[in-house]
């Protein structure tokens, strides 16, 4: 494709993805960088927008460029940029907060109410040839870390953030409900942080098999457990811990039965982190939360240092993200990539769309 073109993968409306030309962005802020996008992962949120046009309060009202799990190469820098140079390969943190909100100043910029997050309406995403980013939301990819691995840094950063929230350390016994990309990476980070037991729970055997590449010490298939069988599910998981409860439980599925079972699986004084986004409302045993004096923590994306730490985990070999990638598509086949993800949800873990040539 021409250097003078800027093709973008655009969600025109629900169920309609097209490649269209967008203006090549120009640097107006001296701290910004122009990037050539090289690889982008498909996230579940992209699929939600494609199928239903919205997630919670974020509703698609106009065509929007998709994608937020990306890596790229620096092709131009603003006059004040000092952190990167032309030619650097980088992972791109896709959410830029207000520099002035209380949340940002308090150190939790991921909670900033004015966050501009890629591919969250009305903000355009990263599935485009050229993209602008502030320099301080880029992390250099060390030699030996591929663009494909760089695109996986975004979901890996969620795993880093959730493990920090939970305080996972050497000897921690962990259970992960949901073996999708975020669940797998959350478990892998737990092992990297020193967890001695990491049990994955999911309804798909192929995903549980893949969990062995992400630090699983054991797995449990939960497909036979309906919403009213949460205690039975928890009992089955606890058998794999020698009948004991877990120190830390990460709920990464958002499924009602798993949320209930996660509470029941957490030990007295233990910690449960709700990572998965499920329904707006769910039923769970709140009396048990109080009676155990357990910590129930919400987790939203990632914050300061998480992207940097995620890149370091990949670069040092402590987390291998390569087994996460199950499918790859050319840029011009992006619509096919999304349709394939929907049609083969139980088979697909992470799909990478390469940048335009």
Curated annotation (Swiss-Prot):
Binding positions (substrate): 49, 154, 301-302
Cofactor (UniProt): Zn(2+)
EC number: 1.1.1.-, 1.1.1.9
UniProt GO molecular function: D-xylulose reductase activity; L-iditol 2-dehydrogenase (NAD+) activity; zinc ion binding
GO biological process per UniProt: hexose metabolic process; sorbitol catabolic process
Pfam families, sorted: ADH_N, ADH_zinc_N
Domain of life: Eukaryota
Residues binding NAD(+), per UniProt: 202, 207, 275-277, 299-301
Catalytic activity: keto-D-fructose + NADH + H(+) = D-sorbitol + NAD(+); xylitol + NAD(+) = D-xylulose + NADH + H(+)
Statement: the UniProt record of this protein carries the keyword Signal: no
UniProt keyword annotation of NAD present: yes
Binding sites annotated in the UniProt record for Zn(2+): 43, 68-69
Family statement: Belongs to the zinc-containing alcohol dehydrogenase family.
Annotated function: Polyol dehydrogenase that catalyzes the reversible NAD(+)-dependent oxidation of various sugar alcohols. Is active with D-sorbitol (D-glucitol) and xylitol as substrates, leading to the C2-oxidized product D-fructose and D-xylulose, respectively.
Name assigned to this protein: Sorbitol dehydrogenase 2
Organism: Saccharomyces cerevisiae (strain ATCC 204508 / S288c) (Baker's yeast)
Lineage: Eukaryota, Fungi, Dikarya, Ascomycota, Saccharomycotina
